[in-house]
Amino acid sequence: MKKLGRIHPNRQVLAFILMVFLSQVRLEPIRYSVLEETESGSFVAHLTKDLGLGIGELASRSARVLSDDDEQRLQLDRQTGDLLLREKLDREELCGPIEPCVLHFQVFLEMPVQFFQGELLIQDINDHSPVFPEREVLLKILENSQPGTLFPLLIAEDLDVGSNGLQKYTISPNSHFHILTRNHSEGKKYPDLVQDKPLDREEQPEFSLTLVALDGGSPPRSGTVMVRILIMDINDNAPEFVHTPYGVQVLENSPLDSPIVRVLARDIDAGNFGSVSYGLFQASDEIKQTFSINEVTGEILLKKKLDFEKIKSYHVEIEATDGGGLSGKGTVVIEVVDVNDNPPELIISSLTSSIPENAPETVVSIFRIRDRDSGENGKMICSIPDNLPFILKPTLKNFYTLVTERPLDRETSAEYNITITVTDLGTPRLKTQQSITVQVSDVNDNAPAFAQTSYTLFVRENNSPALHIGSVSATDRDSGTNAQVTYSLLPPQDPHLPLSSLVSINADNGHLFALRSLDYEALQAFEFRVGASDRGSPALSSEALVRVLVLDANDNSPFVLYPLQNGSAPCTELVPRAAEPGYLVTKVVAVDGDSGQNAWLSYQLLKATEPGLFGVWAHNGEVRTARLLSERDAAKHRLVVLVKDNGEPPRSATATLHVLLVDGFSQPYLPLPEAAPAQSQADSLTVYLVVALASVSSLFLFSVLLFVAVRLCRRSRAASVGRCSVPEGPFPGHLVDVSGTGTLSQSYQYEVCLTGDSGTGEFKFLKPIFPNLLVQDTGREVKENPKFRNSLVFS
């Protein structure tokens, strides 16, 4: 057994006090009786009625019958409540000479724990006859012995007790002797042969008599022994013991061959008649096996180990015989002194190896302790370690119940090894330890817990259907089916979110899949809740939030808002030949449906009728003159402007412009705007859109005024000059202008028709109108703006 460390003294004292207190409780036991040798299965009692219990309560409360010696001689029929004999009982085997013969038992019930004490009295029947240890007894008597002299004879043994035991002795009829039956202090009956008349060896040297031992049964049983009496010549004095009886105490752990006591007998005769030898007289087998006596010295020696718990004292009859055959009798009373040589015993009557974790006051084990020593050596204390959630509860007659002190938590500890220590109070102290293992069975008291309270997943748009986009994970601290987690999608809080068509979840492992291709331009982000449920009863669950962010892909090419590229009559921009370098011809307005850097647009003059005459502002799409115009320059010019985004790979679109150089216009100088600071490129998309629309508005308004003036004042030239036809057309409503900042000095007018649902709009553009009454200032010095060339892209 493994030994524990120091036992907490407070718990020891408490357990001992409770034990002593309960040992004083006198609960009246229920008593029954049965004759020995009654057949097994015989009815003893009806416990349900005797204990005042309801029908079926013995079965529902798991009633059991426990006995002190751990031998199951009784059995309980829980259904009928009958107490039955499990086996045939032999009173002599169970109790020997002890009377009355009582078997103690306990009836144990659970829920709640309850004990009832019981006693079964085994009544003796006359099933044994008296038996003498020998078949013949030789008795030597001097012929001069006087009438009335007593001669001890062999005693008979009868295993029965009471009236069925040995009652008297008789001897066969004769004229010289009769039998006197004497009662000994131990309760035994001794036969003494009493001489009735003088003897004469010469007349009758020998007698052969039959000694009969009778018990008190009905009918009586008997045993016989032959008594042979030899009449001897005179030996005047028989040996006499100096002390009788002798009394001695011997420790039960005395070694073998230890001297117990030396007896002494004296014979006042001389010669051979005065020589004394010693021996055991009518000794039982137990005494012969335990002790021996030296024939010469009279010293009694120990031949076998003593055991106080089995035999507490011995009465040894001794005999001293002289050379003439006369003998004297003596008695040695040997008291066995108890020593603490028996460790306490722990007998488990009931053990529950598995208990639920949420059940306080659950009985784990019922056990009994005992110590076969006596006095202080037999007093015991019982304890368990202090750091365990269990307590010991004494009940009765050294019975204990081990119960849970509070609800257990399997997730903290799934198994307990409990060491029960029983220590006696002897010197030195002896102890016994026994370990029991208790498994804590799981109860579904823990809900699944997600590794994160929220998850953020990133999915690039235009994904393939059934794409694995991420996983959620939850664990359950329980075990078995209580820890098996099932995942599910919970109903979205937004009733308009088609969650069932967007994502799915694997119920077993929490993997999330996109059910269809996602479009960033239609849905940038959405969120939903996932649930994790265990398979306990009842099931417990938890939930987590999942956010899905759709990443933009460069799947939209730039779209040119102005000028429209719809295949109808081209739009012609009018430029006076007197225009100075940096003169704003028009502005290409484009948007990109993507976001971020995928929507950053840049402009480039791809083709031109006359390279070097016009340039395009790279960030805002403004088309300006690059130098002074001359009469040699062609009147009509065709420009192709490339609009490209910043995606990977980049996407692009082209815008075709028609420019007509005209005479007679004034030369309004449009100063080239300062280069936008580097940080303006990082302005938000909303700012770009507002600036672009404002610029277009100004340009269109100015074009309308100029166009009306030209039509009214120079109607004759209208046919040769041409007109800008800008038919109405649909535009996606979600497009935005992310071009660079900048405004037009001319006035433009535009009309935008947008609907939130259709996603389309109508744009109407009008040409800017310049008054033709302005006179060109030919004498004004034209100075080139150095910033202009650095900001334009020339073809």
Curated annotation (Swiss-Prot):
Span of the signal peptide: 1-27
Coiled coil: none
Cytoplasmic side: 711-795
Pfam families (UniProt xref): Cadherin, Cadherin_2, Cadherin_C_2
Membrane topology designation: Single-pass type I membrane protein
Molecular function (Gene Ontology), one example: calcium ion binding
SUPFAM superfamilies to which the protein is assigned, alphabetical: Cadherin-like (SSF49313)
Domain Cadherin as annotated: residue spans: 34-132, 137-241, 246-346, 351-450, 455-560, 567-670
GO terms under biological process: cell adhesion; homophilic cell adhesion via plasma membrane adhesion molecules; nervous system development
Compartment annotation: Cell membrane
Ranges per topology, Extracellular: 28-689
Regions crossing the membrane: 690-710
GO cellular component, as recorded: plasma membrane
Keyword Repeat recorded: yes
Main localization of the protein described in the UniProt heading: membrane
Keywords linked to the UniProt accession: Calcium, Cell adhesion, Cell membrane, Glycoprotein, Membrane, Repeat, Signal, Transmembrane, Transmembrane helix
Record InterPro entries: Cadherin-like_dom, Cadherin-like_sf, Cadherin_C, Cadherin_CS, Cadherin_N, Protocadherin/Cadherin-CA
Residues bearing glycans: 183, 417, 566
Function of the molecule: Potential calcium-dependent cell-adhesion protein. May be involved in the establishment and maintenance of specific neuronal connections in the brain.
Protein name: Protocadherin beta-4
Biological source species: Pan troglodytes
Underlying gene: PCDHB4
